[in-house]
C-alpha cells in the first residue's frame, strides 16, 4: 500500500537514528518516495550524505541551503506528504512538537503537515518515564497524531526498560496497515445523523431510534 506514497521521514538526535537508515531502505523497497528532514543534532548521529545516497534526494535540515540560499518551504513539504514519520523522536523534539516550539525545520514542517503523522519515541528509561514526557506524548496523541509505542529492552545506557524505538519492520507495518485501511474506506458513502431517525414500514408503522 506504500507504492507511490510521499513520506517525510523525520530524524532527530538520538542513538536510535541508525534504525532510520533501515526504515528508509524498507520504505523505498515498498515503493514510497521519501524525503528526509533531519534536525541539527540528528546529523551528529548519521550523515546527510548517507541518507541522500539511499533516498535519492537532498536531505533537508535547515530553512536555507547555505551555499545557494535556496529556501526550503515547510508549507510545500507539508502539502507534498501523504504521511510524516518521525523516527526516532527524542524527548526534546516531542516536547517542541507538543508545545509548538518551531525552532527547526523538522518541527516547523510538522506544524504545517496536512497528512497523518506517526511518532516513534526513543529515549532512555528515566526520560521515558518522566511525567513531562508522558504529558507531551498524550498531548500529541490528543492532536490526532499516531504514537508508535517504544519497546522494552536493553537501552543504550545499558539499563533495561521501555524506551527502545520500535523496530523499522514494525513501523513499516503500521504505515502499511494505515494506508490499507484508508483505501478500504475510499469512495464509501457515510450517513451521519444528529438525532432520531425513522424508517417507514407502512402508513401507520415505522422503525425508529432515539
Which residues does each PLM region occupy?
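A cross-family phosphate/adenosyl-ligand binding-site feature
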Residues: 1-210
